[in-house]
From Swiss-Prot:
The reaction(s) this protein catalyses: tRNA(n+1) + phosphate = tRNA(n) + a ribonucleoside 5'-diphosphate
Organism of this sequence: Neisseria meningitidis serogroup C / serotype 2a (strain ATCC 700532 / DSM 15464 / FAM18)
UniProt xrefs under NCBIfam families: RNasePH (TIGR01966)
UniProt enzyme class: transferase
Binding residues annotated for phosphate, in chain numbering: R89, G127, T128, R129
Role description: Phosphorolytic 3'-5' exoribonuclease that plays an important role in tRNA 3'-end maturation. Removes nucleotide residues following the 3'-CCA terminus of tRNAs; can also add nucleotides to the ends of RNA molecules by using nucleoside diphosphates as substrates, but this may not be physiologically important. Probably plays a role in initiation of 16S rRNA degradation (leading to ribosome degradation) during starvation.
Keyword rRNA processing included in the entry's annotation: yes
Family: Belongs to the RNase PH family.
One Pfam family per UniProt: RNase_PH
Keywords from the UniProt entry: Nucleotidyltransferase, RNA-binding, rRNA processing, Transferase, tRNA processing, tRNA-binding
Lineage, broadest ranks: Bacteria, Pseudomonadati, Pseudomonadota, Betaproteobacteria, Neisseriales
GO function terms (MF aspect): 3'-5'-RNA exonuclease activity; tRNA binding; tRNA nucleotidyltransferase activity
Source superkingdom: Bacteria
Protein name, UniProt field: Ribonuclease PH
Subunit relationships: Homohexameric ring arranged as a trimer of dimers.
Length: 242
């Protein structure tokens, strides 16, 4: 099979990225993140209570919920609420978002409160979980900044930024930031969550069509690191404008 050739962008290029801070007025932090045709609204809400297992421990918590609007995909998705339960995919993704954010927050400095992250996909074209993590960090930083500016916290508990991106191999070609057609037809698909200092929080890798070697994985991680560096700059630009 011939090597895959992207028409609209280079193999090591992100899709067009746009992050709009303060997208919604009735929450402590929010943004709209657009990664090509994938669009996710991310919000952060401060709750002056913690889950029961943390009461009296003088530390906070960050948790996340994720969902897709019925019209976010080409054919209407049934609302999970109407089915009476969340899908395994939804539970997996929201746990991933929560883990990724908690990894960069000092929970003791956050104090005995929690921040609830909501990621709602309004248009899906691949990479919704990675876009959610990248956008959720912006919403979280805005909410925490509010706690600091209001004098509730004396210092910012966020240690460093975090972002995520997908990489994969399509017809033998390593690609950065897969869209839906690429993701659905790839040989392998890897989602990588990384901090600003280059530390890996999570790697989710699957051989969809053909197994990949450790050498190939290393190349994909390097490709992801390049993309995440660019995403971190987009986050910084959005927060500077917030």
């Amino acid at each position: 099979m011939p090597d895959y050739i992207r028409i609209s962008r280079a193999a090591d290029s992100l899709r067009d990225i746009k992050i709009t801070p303060h997208f919604l007025p009735h929450t402590d932090g929010s943004c709209l993140i657009e990664c090509g045709n994938t669009k996710v609204i991310c919000t952060a809400s401060i709750d002056e209570n913690v889950p029961p297992f943390l009461r009296g421990k003088n530390q906070g918590w960050v948790t996340a919920e994720y969902g897709m609007l019925p019209a976010s995909t080409a054919s209407r998705m049934r609302r999970e609420a109407s089915a009476g339960k969340q899908s395994g995919r939804t539970q997996e993704i929201q746990r991933l978002i929560g883990r990724s954010l908690r990894a960069v927050v000092d929970m003791e400095k956050l104090g005995e409160r929690q921040i609830l992250i909501d990621c709602d996909v309004i248009q899906a074209d691949g990479g919704t979980r990675t876009a959610s993590i990248t956008g959720a960090f912006v919403a979280l930083q805005i909410a925490v900044g509010k706690l600091v500016s209001d004098g509730i916290l004396s210092e910012n508990p966020i240690r460093e930024a975090v972002a995520a991106v997908s990489v994969g191999v399509v017809n033998g070609v390593p690609l950065l930031d897969l869209d839906y057609p690429e993701d659905s037809g790839c040989d392998s698909d890897v989602n990588i969550v990384m901090t600003a200092s280059g530390k890996i929080i999570e790697i989710q890798g699957t051989a969809e069509d053909a197994p990949f070697s450790l050498d190939e994985l290393g190349k994909l991680v390097a490709l992801a690191q390049k993309g995440i560096g660019e995403l971190l700059q987009h986050q910084q630009n959005a927060l500077s404008a917030a």
